[in-house]
């Protein structure tokens, strides 16, 4: 195989894609979506094939032989019959070979393309709960414009914000009381799609 760094093609794709965003939609958010997918193989002689755990399998077994790819996709706004529609453009894929974690692969891809978004004001990274960990959160803190939206694990411990200083001696509290997702959140009266929604600033460990 040629020893060529193909990651530069991610930058080229992102740069060309951003040119397609209409001028009157450039204030709309851009989404960088992170996910991973598995490709099963029936043979065992394929290069880098391995036994993988598939939590979404419906074949009676949660394991399969195949490859796992981490993907980064750009979703950008365009006009479609006078309505805003988001166009999905794949930026890059990395095969997970178990030498590096999927978090490391995802973080590296985001860092690779972020220079192309330096002039964008509203960049949002979307991912599921598996990626909401320090490796990826630290990338968000390295740049001025990105934000991150991700699912929290169902067993995540969440706390109220730290109380105001009391002036008493001793170390101030780092967080407030522990919160319950069942009783400490005010949800909307009506569903948004399939879900009730609510908002509250909290603290958690990731």
Question: Which role fits each region the language model picked out?
Answer:
Residues 2-85, 91-92, 195-206:
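Active-site-proximal, Lys/Arg-enriched surface segment
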Residues 94-206:
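An internal, acidic/charged active-site-proximal segment
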Residues 1-2, 125:
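Major-groove recognition helix of helix-turn-helix-like DNA-binding domains
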